[in-house]
Each structure stands twice: as C-alpha cells, then as structure tokens.
C-alpha cells in the first residue's frame, strides 16, 4: 500500500465518508467517535477542538447517554437540533468554548450564539454548565434544570423573565461576570425579586461581580449564599431578611486587607465595613459563616449571639491580632467545630508571645483551629492555655508564625489532639526554661520587612506507593521547614503518644546514635527527608521500637563526602520497620555491604548510584539479598546501563513490585524474570529500550503489570507477550511503534484489562491491521477514540486513527494512478484527432524541428558543466563599445532568446568585490565555455584585453580548447595579421558587425551558433583540423 500524497480528491473523500458511515452503522467502530464513552453513561469530548456539537451515529446507543462533556472546545454556535437525539441527557458541560476576550489566553474576541430551542429540546436536562463563554443573556432553559452555571460570562442583568419557569432549579452559579479579569462597564444588576420565583433554589453564588449591596427579594429557600469579593461594605438585618433557612453565608473579601492581597485590591474605606449588631440575629440555622479578608479589627459578640448552630467560622486575613487575646465573642458558640484565624497579623510586626482569650475555652465542640500567619515568636504553655480543656480539639495549625522558641511538651496535655502543624517556622531547638515560663520579652514587638506574606508551598510528598501517610494515625506533629540543626530528647518530653513526626526540610546534620528520640516510644512514622543526617552509628533509631516507616531521602550531603563511611546496619535492629526510603542520596560507596531486615516490605532506593556499586565486582552484589520479606523495591534513577541475570538473582525472592524507571537500560534479559518467581509488577518506563526481540516473557511468570512507556521501542517480536498468561496491564505508550500486531499477544489479548498505546506514531496506511485488533480489545485501550493518533502519513499526523476508516479507505497511490491514467487516455483520445484535423502540417513541422533541436540540447547539457557560456571582454574606455555590449549584446543574448538564453560573464556585473583583478580574470576565463572579444579595431590591443587574450592562448595550450570568438564592430578598420589568419582557419569564430540593419538578424544567429558550438567544428579542414587532445 502506498503512502498518502497531497490532498484527497473530492470523490475519494465522498467514498471514504460513505465507508465510515457504513462501518459506524455496523457498530464496529467506537460508537461515539470522536468522543469517548466512559462509565455511568458519560461521553467525554473534552479538548478535541471541535467546532460543532458532534452528531453521533443512529446505531450508537444514544439513549444511554446521561452526561455529555464538551469542555474546552471551539463551539461558537449551538443549533436547535444539536442535542435532540440524546433523549436521556441529564448533564451537559459546555465550559470554555467561547470565552470572553479578557479571559481568553490570546485575548481573541468571541461571541457564542445559542438558538432559542437548543436546550428546550432536551426535557431531561438537569445540569448545565455554560461557564467561560461569551454570552450576554440567559438562554431559554427547560423546566427540569436543577443546576445552572453561568460564571465568567458576559451576563450582567438578571430579571424575572430570564429564569422564568425554572421551578426545579436548586443550584445557580453566577461568579466572576464583572471583576478585574473579566471587566465590564457596569456591575451585575439583579432586579428586585428576579430570583424570587425560584422556589426550590438552595445554592446561590454571586462572587466577583462588583455588587454593592445584597440583591433584594432572594428566595427564602436559600441555604447557601456566596457573596464574597464584591463591594458590599454595609450589612444590616434587612439585607438578609426572610433568609431564615440559610446554612452557609460567605460575605468575605468585600472590604479587603490589601497588604496581604495576591491580586488587584481596592482598599477598604476608613470606618468600614459596617455590620449591624443584629445582622445575623435571625439566621438560627446558620452553620458556616465566612468573614475573611474584611478588614475587621474587633468582633462584636452580638454578631454570633443567635448563631447557636454555627459550626464553621472563617475570620482569616483580618486585623484581629489584639482582639483574639481578649475577645468574648466566642462564648456562645458551643457547636463551633472549625475556626480559622489565619493571617490576622499586625503589619510589619512580630509579637514576642501570644495569649489566647479565655473565651476560646467555651468552644467545647472545636475540632480544628487555624492560626498560621499571626506572627509570634514564642510558643509556650500560656499561649494555648485556653484550649487545653477542649475535649474535641483534634487539629491545630500554627505554621508560618516565625516561632523560634517552642515548648513542644505542651501538646501532651491535649488528650484528643491528632494533628499539630508547626511547619514553616524558625524553631531551632528545645525551648529554654525562661522562655517557657513566659517571663521574657513580654509585649516586645519586632518590625518585619514588608512584602507578601502568603503561605508557602506544601512539602514534597513521600514516594508514591512506598511511604505511608499519617492521616490514619492518632497523633502527628509537623516540624518540617524549620531551622532545626540537632535533635535533643528534651524536645519531645511528654509526647510519648506521638505516632508520626515530620522533620523534613530542616538542617539536621548530626550523627544519630539511638538517643535522639527516646521519649517517642509510640512513634510509627518518622520523616527526616531533605536534611544532612550522618548515618555513622549502627544503633541509629533503635530507640524507636514501634517505628514502621522511616524516610531518609534527600540526605545526600554526607554520602557525597569523600572517604567517609556510612553504616546501614541499624535497619536490622528495627523490628517493626516496614517502609524505608533511602532515595536520592547518591549512595555509591563506603556503605554497609548488605541490608538486612526480616520485617521490611518496601524500600525506595531510587536516585542513587547502583551502577557504581555493582561495578565493584561482588562487593555489593548481595546488597538487597538480606531483605527477606521485601515486597516492593524502587531502583529508579540509578544510572543503570545493564541488569545482569546474576544481579536479579540476588534480589529478594519475595519481590512483587520492581521499579527500574528512568535508567539507561537499552537491553533487558527477559528470561531472567524466572529468577523472581513472585514478581507481579515490573516498571521499565523511561529507559532506552529500542526493541522487544531478545526472546519473550518466560512461561510461568506471575507478571500482571508491565510498564514499558517512554522508551524508544519500534519493534516487538511475534508472541513476545503470549506466554505471560497472567499479564493484565500493559503500558506501551510514548514509544516509536508504527503498528500493534495481534501476533504479539496470542491468546493473551482477550484477557488484557489495560493496553495503553497512546503517544506512538502509528502508520495509518489503508488496511492497517492494528485497527481491527484495537477494535477487538477497545474496552482495554484507554483513550482509543481521541488519544491514539497517527504518526504518518503526513496528512493524518496527529489525528485520531479513526479520522478515516483505514479498513475501508481507498489506496491513495492507486487512486491517483488510476485517475491520472484515465485523464490522460481521455485527453489523448480527444486531442489527437482534433489536432490532426486542424493543424496536421504544423504539428509535423514542429515535430521535426524538435528532433533537430533535442540532440543539440542534449550535447549542450552534457558539456555544460561551467557556470557561464561566454566571458565578454572589451575596452571599457571606449564608451560606444561598452554601450553596445550592455544594451545590445547582453539584451539580445540573455533576454530575447527565451529558453535558449545564454549566460554571459561581465566584469562590471559578475566580478566579486574583494578579489584581485587577476583572481577575477582567472576565474572568469576558466568558468566560461567561450571568450567573446568585442573589438572596435584590432591593431592596438593592451591592458585587460591583452591579458585575457594571453590567458585564452594559455588555455589553448593546456586544455587544447580554442575558446576565442571575435566580434569586430568596425569591419572597414585595419585588421591585424592574427585576425586575418583566424578568418582563414576558423572563419565562423570571427564575426563582423554589419552596417546595414538588414544583416543584423543574420549576425545574431551566427553569434549564437559560435557561442553554443565547439570551435572544433568551424575549422577549415583544407588548412587545419584545429586543436586536438593528446591521448
């Protein structure tokens, strides 16, 4: 089958379209091309750059489609008939198809057109998302609608007519229609009572709309009202009248604190916001209240007096740094479970210590307290004294407070505390006694540098699938990203029930010897990653008898020190250790020759230098063999170029998962997998494998998952996977495969659950066999309709393999050949008789003229290896001669001969500047077939003419080629003896300019002949045979 060339002929396109329709009708192709049918009746058409809604085949189970996602396409026009065929459609996502110009990445203007009955034709529709589309009015909507999103559009007016008839609507989102990213000429206008007809509306979000007041006439059924980041700076009871069913109210960001803003901010007017004391007095069912970023300096207790059911209160990003030490506002909030006071700092000030107000002690249901970003330097028992007797308190967030002295033992007095976050502070060690009593630095303030004080990024998570988290443990303390240099046992006094300790990203550089964590007898997870630990002592961490997970990754500095040894024998002395990470330490030499443990089940050894360790003979050959219970082993990024069978033979036989990602393996001995009899998952992604041709997966292997993605595999041997009968998941994505053959799998193909072939340059030739095979196993191929793409031919590159049905498409090369042959036959059949009848004699004459011309042209092409036909030499000092050369000779020979034009070399035009005169002259003589001397007279020749003539004579002597052609403009002038002799021997190489105009035509014909033919043919055979080449 030939490759595709050029554009498809319209007839071919028509035939292929018909073939595709037939295939779809037969149900052989994926039913919802170009989209993908996913679970629960969802048809996913995201990111396909569609310009219209796809109309699926009648043979597709359109009645089973309940959700259609058209997110991030280019659909600018919605027709009445677009969704008629989807009779069971309940959810429709049209987000990001025609965004407003200000929200578009390229700021292109766009306008979406929606015809009147587009959505009315879908009476079952319940959820509709039209966010991020440039629409200015609410389209006609079916009464069945339950959820409607019109956020980030250009809708600026809401009146009763817009939403009439939507009696089932419960969720309405109209966020961001008028703010700095989506500017507008006016704020969103909600007419009084515009939403009153929505009797079942429970969720209303109007954030980022430049509203200056709460819309009037809201439906009393509202339970969630979100009005944050508008310009509502006054709230009174009448603003929320009749909203007695409210459960969540968000009015934060309406009067902002701009020194902590991360986006354009308008300063809150002085004396605002103004919240009437009874604003929330009638909201008895309120469970969540957001007053964040509202420039509050004080809390009025009357605000919360009637909120007995309040569970969540967000007061972050205000100015409550003094209020929280003396307020009584929390005394009536017995049901409050979460309180956020983050970033209530004094601008440019850090307090020496902080004492929470006694009213915190009345929050008997409090479970989580966020207090990061308040900026106090000392954490002592008096700081949290008000919280000690809260029986439900589980989570305490104190990160990013610039704390440099912390009495960690105070957390032992909190019986229900499960998580304490002290990360991103400046804690450097155990708190001194004076500081712990709170006697020093009382009330002192330290000025801080100005700047953004946003919360820093979270730490890097542990290795996925290897290190467990701490969410299920009873007590976790996070001290990551502090200034700890050493660990002292006194730091953890009274913390014996601590089960998870996070110390990553400090500067701990001490040699751990088994005494640092002695009080932590219940510790199960210890994270010491991103430090500088010295593992010299053999009893490191042995004081932790219950330790199950230990993360020592990214402690590479000690291992990079030349000549320093490292002792890993402590692993054998941790009886409960199940997870260990030594990743990214660049371990390569002077370490224990063998790791031993009877309990370890997962080891992350990625990012080291096993290639250097295993290059030391048998010194580290048995490095992992002593891990008798090891199930998972990660050897990624170890710079491995080869993996010998004896190396695999010395890995633990209990292994079930082996990762070898991102090494340099160009060869793998597949038969050696029998040496790991329990191996179920093998990850070889990101290596340099180019072919799977050396043998096959061995018979009897337990392998279930094989990842070969991101290699350079272009060939797979027949039956390579066939013997691995337990294989269920195979990843061949991002390779160089041009086809996928069923012969690779044998009977295994029908049992595969995952076969990933995305990112391969598949060759989409007509009749490609891989299409039939992928259709047979399409349930196992992720992204088959839209993400399995062609790599060739060029016109299909980057397109889905179903852009045309490769099983029924026409052979492109054969199509063009047949088309060309038929066209030629018809043309000749019509043209030959007609031309013979009309101009037979003329054609006969032209035919013989061409026969006479072709041999001459052939000879000329054979000899024409030089860039110029003639080098024109004349005396520039004679203006008449120069004028004749430029305006007569050049025009006649170069411009008026058509396709027989000659290439002349002229001194003024073709000589290269920067070269000497002789270099240019030499190049011109030897780059031209002939030398044309234009002379007014022949008796006195000097200068350039003489030098050129001597070079021509030299060429005659050296190359035996006579290249001289003379043109004499004054025939009556005295002729030299050389000219007369040349006229006698080679008359056609001496041409005289005729005085009569009638003879000029003959002159130009003779000159053309003289310049295009060899002078050998012009010599008079009676006198001379001309120059001959010596044999």
UniProtKB/Swiss-Prot annotation:
Subunit structure: Monomer and homodimer. Exists as a monomer in the absence of unmethylated cytidine-phosphate-guanosine (CpG) ligand. Proteolytic processing of an insertion loop (Z-loop) is required for homodimerization upon binding to the unmethylated CpG ligand leading to its activation. Interacts with MYD88 via their respective TIR domains. Interacts with BTK. Interacts (via transmembrane domain) with UNC93B1. Interacts with CD300LH; the interaction may promote full activation of TLR9-triggered innate responses.
Any single GO BP term: toll-like receptor signaling pathway
Ranges where the TIR domain occurs: 866-1011
Membrane topology of this protein: Single-pass type I membrane protein
UniProt-annotated location(s): Endoplasmic reticulum membrane; Endosome; Lysosome; Cytoplasmic vesicle, Phagosome
Role description: Key component of innate and adaptive immunity. TLRs (Toll-like receptors) control host immune response against pathogens through recognition of molecular patterns specific to microorganisms. TLR9 is a nucleotide-sensing TLR which is activated by unmethylated cytidine-phosphate-guanosine (CpG) dinucleotides. Acts via MYD88 and TRAF6, leading to NF-kappa-B activation, cytokine secretion and the inflammatory response. Upon CpG stimulation, induces B-cell proliferation, activation, survival and antibody production.
InterPro entries: Leu-rich_rpt, Leu-rich_rpt_typical-subtyp, LRR_12, LRR_dom_sf, TIR_dom, Toll_tir_struct_dom_sf
Disulfide bonds: 35-45, 98-110, 178-184, 255-268, 258-265, 470-500, 764-790, 766-809
LRR repeats by residue range: 62-85, 87-110, 122-147, 150-166, 167-190, 198-221, 223-242, 243-268, 283-306, 308-332, 333-356, 363-386, 390-413, 415-440, 470-494, 496-519, 520-543, 545-572, 574-598, 600-622, 627-650, 652-675, 676-699, 701-723, 724-747, 749-772
Superkingdom in the source lineage: Eukaryota
Post-translational modification summary for this protein: Activated by proteolytic cleavage of the flexible loop between repeats LRR14 and LRR15 within the ectodomain. Cleavage requires UNC93B1. Proteolytically processed by first removing the majority of the ectodomain by either asparagine endopeptidase (AEP) or a cathepsin followed by a trimming event that is solely cathepsin mediated and required for optimal receptor signaling. Palmitoylated by ZDHHC3 in the Golgi regulates TLR9 trafficking from the Golgi to endosomes. Depalmitoylation by PPT1 controls the release of TLR9 from UNC93B1 in endosomes.
The keyword tRNA processing is annotated on this UniProt entry: no
Cleaved signal peptide residues: 1-25
Transmembrane segments: 818-838
Gene3D superfamilies linked: Ribonuclease Inhibitor, Toll/interleukin-1 receptor homology (TIR) domain
Keywords from the UniProt entry: Cytoplasmic vesicle, Disulfide bond, Endoplasmic reticulum, Endosome, Glycoprotein, Immunity, Inflammatory response, Innate immunity, Leucine-rich repeat, Lipoprotein, Lysosome, Membrane, Palmitate, Receptor, Repeat, Signal, Transmembrane, Transmembrane helix
Regions of this protein lying in the Cytoplasmic compartment: 839-1031
Organism this protein belongs to: Felis catus
Annotated GO MF terms: pattern recognition receptor activity; protein homodimerization activity; siRNA binding; unmethylated CpG binding
Protein name, UniProt field: Toll-like receptor 9
Glycosylation sites: 64, 129, 200, 210, 242, 340, 474, 513, 567, 669, 694, 699, 731
GO CC annotation terms, alphabetical: early phagosome; endolysosome; endoplasmic reticulum; endoplasmic reticulum membrane; endosome; lysosome; plasma membrane
Keyword Transmembrane applies: yes
Extracellular topological domain: 26-817
